[in-house]
Amino acid sequence: MMDVIYILWLRQLKRYLRSKSRIIGSLGQPVLFLFALGFGFGPIFQKAGQGNYIQFLTPGIIAMSILFTSIFSGIEIIWDRQFGFLKETLVAPVPRWQIMVGRTLGGATVATFQGLIVFVISLIAGFKPQNPAMLIFAFLIMILTAILFTALGTAIASILTDMQGFQLIMNFLIMPLFFLSGALFPLNGLPKILSILISLDPLSYGVDGLRGSLTGLSHYNLTVDFTVLIIISVILTGLGSYLFSKIQI
């Protein structure tokens, strides 16, 4: 079992590391957000008495990078289906859920790596973790967030057959998930309806967990963040495994 999962995990990782253009291209938007918003809105944020905006913004940008990378990893399923690799994989004498788990862990590893790169860039931009001892918790939050959204991307890709449809659905999902996560603004004092929508957004708990572990500022608390992320990750991984097992070849 572990051989199948490991091989597919390693394949995802090798594809990522061999594509330097993909690595550089996927960093463009997070870096733009970090520097343009961080330094552009920084003075306004400070005048409002909210402190250093780079400190506040960085966890949200790390989460954004993980979200984009992990959820779009599902497109590789459609790509492999069109070029015949998926068929060869699915006819192998192994349970399909193992194939799905291997691909999901591979996509999550890539997304976590992207998040770590953005974290390093944020240090150059002036971000300072409040407590280095809490970095391990931030890393765990990154992993859980990556697994959650990779599983979501895989589940959606399992029921679609064309890249255009997948990209349209992902774009429809990604922007609300990101903007309702509290990545760009504090969650205190918001209208009730907006607070409800934010609490229903799973990315909110990834952002809050990163912000809590990196800066000590948490709207919920780390226990709630970890619990919600674990539960939703398990549910989406199970759903993704089921939908992946129903793919027709």
List the predicted regions and their residue ranges.
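Alpha-helical transmembrane segments and their short interhelical loops
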Residues: 96, 100-170, 217-241
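Pore- or pathway-lining transmembrane helices of multi-pass membrane proteins that form conduits
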Residues: 24-32, 161-181
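Short cytosolic juxtamembrane segments of multi-pass membrane proteins
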Residues: 242-249
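Aromatic- and glycine-rich beta-strand/loop motifs that create alpha-glucan
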Residues: 1-29
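Short, hydrophobic transmembrane alpha-helix segments
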Residues: 39-50
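Hydrophobic alpha-helical transmembrane segments of multi-pass membrane transport proteins
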Residues: 32-37, 53-124, 145, 153, ...
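Residues that define the loop-to-transmembrane-helix transition and helix capping
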Residues: 20-21, 55, 97, 164, ...
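Membrane-interfacial helix-loop-helix junctions in multi-pass membrane proteins
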Residues: 15, 46-48, 128, 178-235
